[in-house]
Amino acid sequence: MEENESQKCEPCLPYSADRRQMQEQGKGNLHVTSPEDAECRRTKERLSNGNSRGSVSKSSRNIPRRHTLGGPRSSKEILGMQTSEMDRKREAFLEHLKQKYPHHASAIMGHQERLRDQTRSPKLSHSPQPPSLGDPVEHLSETSADSLEAMSEGDAPTPFSRGSRTRASLPVVRSTNQTKERSLGVLYLQYGDETKQLRMPNEITSADTIRALFVSAFPQQLTMKMLESPSVAIYIKDESRNVYYELNDVRNIQDRSLLKVYNKDPAHAFNHTPKTMNGDMRMQRELVYARGDGPGAPRPGSTAHPPHAIPNSPPSTPVPHSMPPSPSRIPYGGTRSMVVPGNATIPRDRISSLPVSRPISPSPSAILERRDVKPDEDMSGKNIAMYRNEGFYADPYLYHEGRMSIASSHGGHPLDVPDHIIAYHRTAIRSASAYCNPSMQAEMHMEQSLYRQKSRKYPDSHLPTLGSKTPPASPHRVSDLRMIDMHAHYNAHGPPHTMQPDRASPSRQAFKKEPGTLVYIEKPRSAAGLSSLVDLGPPLMEKQVFAYSTATIPKDRETRERMQAMEKQIASLTGLVQSALFKGPITSYSKDASSEKMMKTTANRNHTDSAGTPHVSGGKMLSALESTVPPSQPPPVGTSAIHMSLLEMRRSVAELRLQLQQMRQLQLQNQELLRAMMKKAELEISGKVMETMKRLEDPVQRQRVLVEQERQKYLHEEEKIVKKLCELEDFVEDLKKDSTAASRLVTLKDVEDGAFLLRQVGEAVATLKGEFPTLQNKMRAILRIEVEAVRFLKEEPHKLDSLLKRVRSMTDVLTMLRRHVTDGLLKGTDAAQAAQYMAMEKATAAEVLKSQEEAAHTSGQPFHSTGAPGDAKSEVVPLSGMMVRHAQSSPVVIQPSQHSVALLNPAQNLPHVASSPAVPQEATSTLQMSQAPQSPQIPMNGSAMQSLFIEEIHSVSAKNRAVSIEKAEKKWEEKRQNLDHYNGKEFEKLLEEAQANIMKSIPNLEMPPATGPLPRGDAPVDKVELSEDSPNSEQDLEKLGGKSPPPPPPPPRRSYLPGSGLTTTRSGDVVYTGRKENITAKASSEDAGPSPQTRATKYPAEEPASAWTPSPPPVTTSSSKDEEEEEEEGDKIMAELQAFQKCSFMDVNSNSHAEPSRADSHVKDTRSGATVPPKEKKNLEFFHEDVRKSDVEYENGPQMEFQKVTTGAVRPSDPPKWERGMENSISDASRTSEYKTEIIMKENSISNMSLLRDSRNYSQETVPKASFGFSGISPLEDEINKGSKISGLQYSIPDTENQTLNYGKTKEMEKQNTDKCHVSSHTRLTESSVHDFKTEDQEVITTDFGQVVLRPKEARHANVNPNEDGESSSSSPTEENAATDNIAFMITETTVQVLSSGEVHDIVSQKGEDIQTVNIDARKEMTPRQEGTDNEDPVVCLDKKPVIIIFDEPMDIRSAYKRLSTIFEECDEELERMMMEEKIEEEEEEENGDSVVQNNNTSQMSHKKVAPGNLRTGQQVETKSQPHSLATETRNPGGQEMNRTELNKFSHVDSPNSECKGEDATDDQFESPKKKFKFKFPKKQLAALTQAIRTGTKTGKKTLQVVVYEEEEEDGTLKQHKEAKRFEIARSQPEDTPENTVRRQEQPSIESTSPISRTDEIRKNTYRTLDSLEQTIKQLENTISEMSPKALVDTSCSSNRDSVASSSHIAQEASPRPLLVPDEGPTALEPPTSIPSASRKGSSGAPQTSRMPVPMSAKNRPGTLDKPGKQSKLQDPRQYRQANGSAKKSGGDFKPTSPSLPASKIPALSPSSGKSSSLPSSSGDSSNLPNPPATKPSIASNPLSPQTGPPAHSASLIPSVSNGSLKFQSLTHTGKGHHLSFSPQSQNGRAPPPLSFSSSPPSPASSVSLNQGAKGTRTIHTPSLTSYKAQNGSSSKATPSTAKETS
């Protein structure tokens, strides 16, 4: 009843119509405030008169009864809000109801009137709500009619049916109010927290009846529309089970049933107000009124309170919002019946929410008032009907004033509601205005201003309302109620309450007194809602209204009737308002109406002062007064008996309906279950079918099936023939017997028959025999796979054993060579080494070319296309020698390739990309075979290759299987076409071919050992000499004129731009990055012209330069094709890479593809920065801008560029970034800059090992700056910017492709870096600068020319070609050695190929644009290394272009591999450092990485294939560069001394690297070059490259397959891959011994110059980084914990530490980890450490990476999580040992360096190494410091160890993980901790950012890290791998373990 009454009050406007119908009884009561109200009243009066509760005026009802919904009433106005169609529907429905239920005609008519009134009145008063209400009203008409009837029966049925929304609210008002009076029972309607008690309608015919009941009960909160929406459900409570279930059958509704409206939409769950405001308010009011009419009387309290609840509800009206406000509803149930007390209490309490909801709609407050009145009346003991009428009418009357109050209350509520339904604020306001337009509008205006306050207040009131509602237990005490309501409802509600008390004056005339109280209460509400003033105002007004109307509306029937009429009007208005609200247009009208109302109200009452609520009330009151003549109330509770019986019937019906609903529910559930089962079955069946289809579609399977069918057919035929033959034999036998038997005669006919049969059988047999060969061939084709598999299983173990032996031998040789190189680094054996290496490479290249051709032919294109992705992997394996390297660091690169295998493959062979996979594989196998002979030269590569080869074999076998399947299919086709062609022999041939193919891919490894051993012996010596010469001569040359042999190789490299698989080694040897790279390396080594095939191949490779070494065209047969294809591929790849660029730069560390794309992008960006994505462009921007400038300048005048760099021209352009970092924090900046520079330099170093050397020197110098720059992200950015710019310059240099230029440029860069470093550490910088400048200037001279062009790909090619020619050794004197023995690596996505300078030249010339070349010179390596600070490591994106890494110094293939590995790994490590340092700066780092990648790309480009070739060329280039770098660093004054020592140690690394151009040299050089310039590959690619390089190091193969495991990359792996790539690249940088040495010099210089400041800075940075590192470490730990490869890395690291042979194996393990690292950024960090280690180890570890990147990584990762650093370190040290025979020497040296480095530096390392565990790293580093000496030997044994010389660099590196400088710094700090440097690189790549970046945050730690560099390097290394993410996450752990392991 309360609900009803409340609703009546609320809907009073809408209800006015009903009320007016009820006003039939008292038409005079309806004083419509607004014309609409009047009209509604009149209409309703008409209807009332006609239908006065009876079906008197159905015609009247014909008057758009829809108005309730906003139809006729202001339907025109409301039509704006609601569709006329709705009105029509409602009207038709009501008419139908009237006809169907004549006895309810009056009620229905009243409903129609209400609808019409609402349509108009809402327009006038509540346009917002009418629509909403209208919709509900529609249903209300049905349901509400019934409900209302039932309610009206109980509660003044008449008012209910008409006045209180009973009017068609309950559509099924079958009985008149009399029937309603004889309500079948009571229904408790709950909405939100409101519960209202309503008389049960005599009939509940449909769900619409229930909805109408709800709408009438909660007019403000609910509308038919809302209730009909699918998101709203009506639940009925099963008392027996105490559960709610959806009401499906209205017959389930029985007396005392508790119905609940549940809004499934959470947004509306507690936002009743919004919708209430929209139309719920009106609906609720109408419902309330209807209920008030019907149930109201029976439950006066309920009715009275329901209005209150409804007013509250209105705020909660929106079903969603209404839910909370629902309390009014809740009260309805318990409180409603207790309306007076209970409602006051419960409703009030809940009603606080109700008021809230009410506030949503002004009317609700009126209803609330009514509610209060009703409860009062109830309290007074008035009849429910009377109460309801009184409540509704009296309230309406009093509340017409009150109504205005209500309107204001609604207005206020809307304001209150806003709180719940801010969104509905306007709607609520509209509805409020619709309800009480005048006051509402005034209130709305006020409240809109106060709206939110009120809304808040409302919520306050809502909550308070709940509380306050309860307080006024007696609705009679309106003040209490009002206090509560006002509180809850806010001013509007308060006024309504106030009015209600007045209105309730019949029941609560005393309430007039209370209005004051109410006002006070309202004040509390106001206070609650901030609308206290408004509330007070409205309450006061309402008080006035109440005072005025209280007398009028006391218990007088007339007043009550009038109030009911008013309520009807209000209900109609509410409906109209809701309709208007729902149909926007009428809203304005409603507002106008509201304005009118307000005006009227103002005129009528002086309530305008309040929020206008009083006005509305006044207006309504006036209306009520006008219609004061109380419409004869329909039989109030006269029909109570009937009502009860009806209620009981209804209850029984409800029960039945409940049961039916339950049954329906069960049925539906069953249906759903069946559906689900069917779906499941369907899915299963479809899955099975799909599987079957796939199986059938499988070519092998298809062939099998076909063959089997043929075989069965054949057997069937054979069977028949046999049967016939048997029969014939029997027949002949019989004839024979007969012939012998005299008794029988054998006739001639019998004989002829026999002969005929025999002829048939014979023909059949002949046919069968003819068919058999075909069948045989087919079956053999099918079985070939099995045969191959069996053969593989048989032969693989032996192959692996041989590979391991080779790896071990290579490890020994490389160790020896490393010592040799270290000792003879400055001797000048470069030329001899280079010559030998070149010769070796030529041989290898030739073999590779042959193999590639063979493989290409044998493999078959189909297989290629089929196995393209796989090819990348398997190719890595086949190209074990070189590809292993590729696999090791190319895992990262390859990943991009795998993203776009075509990219990598194009470099190798276009078929590779598209269908070349098989060719590259076979080519790889061929290359492997050809490289196998070389393998001896590269023992470690062989060893690594072995491990890698395992993987290779697996991949190859898979490939071969695919290939063989493809071939089998093809052959089958051929056989089918030419059955005769295939005889047993041919089939045997086919099998043999297949076997050969398999063997090519698999046996190649064994072959290399056989062939390889010979080169090994020579190569090591030569390599050593070369390394020494190359480093010395190159460095010297660089110093002298920068025209050391290394510069010339760069030109060849240039020739072999990334597109070509060729990379020029430092020596100038062009290493085919892919197989072709190896071939190219040979050719290049021979000279650009030595092997036309190679050149052709190179060129083809070059063409797809963008496809990193995906398909080295060098395959002779497919050279042209490959060339073209590669060019196409290169273009495609370029496009792809350009696309990738965007993500690439972002994914510098994460995605190999990103890296390649970066490299490619860089190449492209170098040419056109526009191509680079914004982010890339940022990096590239400075990078590219500078690079472009550099390119232009380089192209125009490389020297100019160098001068720029040297003089600061670059600085002017770059300085903004470089100097920025420097200026920001000179020491930090220098470190950061160094770090970045190092990364960039590493990139550039990759592009130009010479440059890298310079870069390293530069980086060393810059490293301090970079480190310091890295102290802050800003410095890091500056550094990155610097790095980017410098990198850009270097990149330009790389682009120029003139190794010399690159070298010079790098040196210049280094000079700049050095200068900058000078700023941070003048001593070191000066030393580095002096050295750098010497080298740089000289190198610049040499490099300037060729390298000028190097910048752009094409320019690069042009320049590169010149320089590469020089690289060929003819190009430049410096590269003489390189020319003779210079090894270049062409690194593509799938392969690492050793190329000769000639090959490189050819490739570069062919694919100038598509190939990135990086010249790595021992001397230059140092410079690049310094420069690496600026141009840390070009991020190599093999995806885009093959990178040719040209080692300017002659070196063994294995040495080259080793150096290459160092290059790559450090880059990655640096990246990891970057990553670690800036978990925060991760993006920046990625940008850095992008720059780095770009630099790498550029460098790669400049180095011709440094990126793709990076893996290989990187090894070799670095191998060659490293000696040079070492030489350069050694030459560095001051720090140079250190560098020399370090270099000697490094030389140790470098020399062995250069000398052992093979594996060790490669590892060492890789390490050193790494530090010089690191190629940043995506982690996976890096891992793959590392693995491949390791394999190459072990096997010395010229072509290594880089298998990138991209699957891992997709998850965190991708990011980790990026990290791994960065990490490895970073590592590569530290591994650049020269650069490390330089960095060490720098660091020592810096340390000496500002060791304290730097240490502090490093420490700070470290600590800063450590925090982020801790997080990163945690993340990494999580990631790593998920990656089993960790253990592998650990094993790798440990093995690495344990023994050189193990080192290769461990390298493999580490490599896998790197692979995983590439796969998993965080986890990959640790693996990357391994990878860098593996890379350092060279190919030796590479095989592992390639072969078991995942497994090993998985293994390592688990343990490596904490041990990654350790193992990584160990691995690096071991690798170093492996690579460096003098690893211990280096270790020893490094030890001193490490000890010399303060513990603080170790912290830097610790952060660096502790990127995984930046903090533990610090402590670990402390322990590591001691350990560094102990570990350093092992570290020294690692390439890092040689790089211990540059531990200072390591520190720098750590700071400039980005640049790779950090590692150098770390190394520099470590001094002897080159491996540490390596580790920092690795860690700096990942972990170092905390440390490396320590330079910025962990700057102090960076120092420590540097100290730790020796021991911590590994730690850092692992953290790097682990640390990329482990930096922040698991790096911490990794570092501790690292420290432990280090110790």
Swiss-Prot record:
Species source reads: Homo sapiens
Amino acid composition bias (Polar residues), ranges on this chain: 48-62, 1368-1377, 1491-1501, 1512-1533, 1643-1653, 1691-1706, 1731-1747, 1834-1843, 1853-1869, 1906-1943
Location comes to: Cytoplasm, Cytoskeleton, Microtubule organizing center, Centrosome; Cytoplasm
The record lists glycosylation at: S357
Keyword Cytoplasm: yes or no? yes
Q: Where is the composition biased (Basic and acidic residues)?
A: 38-47, 1155-1167, 1174-1192, 1305-1318, 1539-1548, 1612-1625, 1763-1775
Annotated function: Required for normal development of intervertebral disks.
* Coiled coil location: 557-581, 644-685, 957-985, 1464-1490, 1656-1686
List-wise, which residues carry Phosphothreonine?
T470
Gene Ontology BP annotations? embryonic skeletal system development
Q: Which UniProt keywords apply?
A: Coiled coil, Cytoplasm, Cytoskeleton, Developmental protein, Glycoprotein, Phosphoprotein
Any one GO CC term of this protein is: cytoplasm
UniProt-recorded name of the protein: Sickle tail protein homolog
Phosphotyrosine is carried by which residues?
A: Y244, Y393
Q: Where is the composition biased (Pro residues)?
A: 308-328, 1044-1053
**Disordered, as annotated region:** 1-79, 112-177, 290-331, 456-476, 848-874, 1003-1230, 1305-1329, 1352-1377, 1481-1572, 1606-1660, 1677-1943
Tell me, how does this one assemble?
Interacts with CPNE4 (via VWFA domain).
Please report a single Pfam family linked to this protein: AIP3
Q: Where is the composition biased (Low complexity)?
A: 1806-1825, 1892-1905
Q: Which residues carry this modification: Phosphoserine?
A: 169, 361, 365, 474, 526, 809, 1027, 1030, 1033, 1044, 1461, 1739, 1841, 1896, 1899, 1902
